[in-house]
Regions:
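Active-site entrance/lid segments in N-terminal catalytic domains of soluble metabolic enzymes
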Residues: 1-178
Length: 178
């Protein structure tokens, strides 16, 4: 269980999260997993209209599904549009996702969204160090996504030369978060 001190969005379910990767964080996956109490972070490519329609047609998914955005202006516009369309009373979780969370803009966006939408549970990542975990929490993130480049299908390590062993990252980030 996750009890959020900042909003009424307390999560009670299976502590497994389907990633917002292409082919994983889909509407179909969210519908199927929500029946089992499993959380889904949707992919960032859905439009505001698609998201509004999905959550209108599937209110049960509001309990354990996060809208995902990046840090581009179009992503922020998408978030504002979804919140403005009356869906604001149902959107509880937001995943702010970048492949490598080590930029000043990333922490700034987390802080701006926290100030604008205090009721949201913000999931932010991806990071692999205690310092950035701490920065995101101080900026307003409730949950920090940990991991850069450890997966077998992840291309971040190959394309950017940035990666970190997953267990080491979890240990370091969990220590900083506590």
């Amino acid at each position: 269980n996750y009890d959020n001190p900042d909003s009424e969005a307390d999560y009670h379910g299976v502590p497994i999260m389907a990633s917002n990767m292409d082919g994983v964080g889909t509407f179909e996956m969210a519908r199927a997993l929500s029946k089992q109490g499993v959380f889904t972070c949707l992919v960032k490519t859905y439009t505001a209209d698609e998201l509004i329609q999905f959550f209108t047609d599937n209110p049960i998914c509001c309990v354990n599904t996060a809208m995902s955005i990046g840090i581009a202006y179009k992503d922020l516009e998408n978030l504002h549009a979804v919140k403005k369309e009356g869906y604001k009373h149902h959107l509880k979780y937001l995943c702010i996702d970048v492949a490598n969370g080590y930029s000043e803009r990333f922490a700034t966006i987390v802080e701006e969204i926290r100030q604008t939408y205090a009721d949201l549970v913000i999931i932010a990542g991806n990071v692999v160090t205690g310092e950035m975990t701490e920065e995101l929490i101080l900026s307003g993130a409730n949950i920090v996504k940990v991991g850069i480049g450890p997966g077998s299908v992840c291309t971040t390590r190959i394309k950017t030369g940035v990666g970190y062993p997953q267990l080491s990252a979890i240990i370091e980030c969990a220590d900083a978060a506590h």
